[in-house]
Amino acid sequence: PDAIAQLLNEGKVQLFCADAVDGEGLLNGDLPQRRRAELQEKYFVYLTAELAPRILTLNNAKKGTQIWTAGVDLGAYHAVHCRLRRPTLFAGAVGMGGIYDLTRFWGTDSDDMVLRCSPLAYLQENGIANKPALAKAEENCLILCAGQGAYEGDALDDTQALADLLKDQGMPAHLEIWGGDVSHDWYW
């Protein structure tokens, strides 16, 4: 990552990569919807209760240490989901080509666990996202972007819908819509 090479070399930034369980949970059509949502919630708990504290411990919890999340596609979902639900733990997020409407994967039936895992749904409810903390956040603490190229349609729709919903609720986010040359493909 040449864009942040200097920050990495100076020790100002560290990168951690968390493997996901999307194949076992969210994308596993052989499991009931509730079980898939439970696995997503367990992964969220792992990120927030184990990985993030471990990152802070590795840095001796230096004052001012901030954790940002970033991801592409379902990684964007996880990154933004963590920021929305735990904004006091995660200082910011960058979601690139993200899917935020999980009904695409598990249908429209909903219960408390399914709701808890679906940003476009839970932001319309109270008690799941920390809305007061999100409303105080700076705009550039949540960056949403999507392209207009091949295979980017669902991500573009969800990214725009999430940005609109956040704006309507007074929660700042920075939206970037990239051109038709930005596709939803592996070489990115």
Model-inferred region functions:
Residues 1-188:
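Non-catalytic cap/lid and distal C-terminal segments of serine-dependent acyl enzymes
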